[in-house]
Regions:
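Feature marking well-ordered beta-strand scaffolds used for ligand recognition
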Residues: 1-144
Length: 144
């Protein structure tokens, strides 16, 4: 972000995300910390995924809190909460174990795998001013 390298470790114990800068000498310095709440749903964070889209850097955090959160990096390394997707009956995002992000045709496609529910979650993220997400659920048959 703006030529600066950042590291975002998650603490499952404290339910927080911490943003650290990494300078050329390898020294880490704290920049920001975000605590989980019912509005963010990354308690016990186990999975983080980062990506860039149209010049912006993003982080997705998921844990054992039945959902995931999308954050954008500000120019000074602060995490700006954009959206949270909470688990519902038709979205297998409880206890997410893996996240995959791909940019297809300019759209951000987010795929999730749950450790406790069948299926693959598929979300199309709209990173416009509304920063909302649309969800689809894809189910795979067990072939052996």
């Amino acid at each position: 972000v703006q030529g600066q390298s950042y590291i975002v470790p998650a603490s499952a114990g404290t339910g927080s995300l911490t943003v650290l800068t990494l300078d050329s000498a390898g020294v880490l310095s704290p920049v920001d910390q975000v605590a989980d709440s019912l509005n963010t749903r990354f308690q016990g964070a186990q999975v983080l995924e980062s990506f860039t889209h149209q010049g912006n850097a993003y982080v997705i955090a998921a844990g054992q809190d039945s959902g995931l959160s999308l954050f954008r990096f500000s120019d000074d390394g602060q995490l700006v909460h954009l959206d949270t997707i909470a688990d519902q009956l038709n979205t297998p995002i409880n206890s997410i174990t893996d996240i995959y992000v791909d940019i297809i045709g300019g759209d951000v496609q987010l795929f999730t795998v749950s450790g406790s529910e069948a299926g693959i979650g598929h979300f199309t993220l709209s990173l416009s001013t509304t920063s909302s997400a649309q969800a689809d659920v894809l189910f795979a048959q067990d072939t052996g």
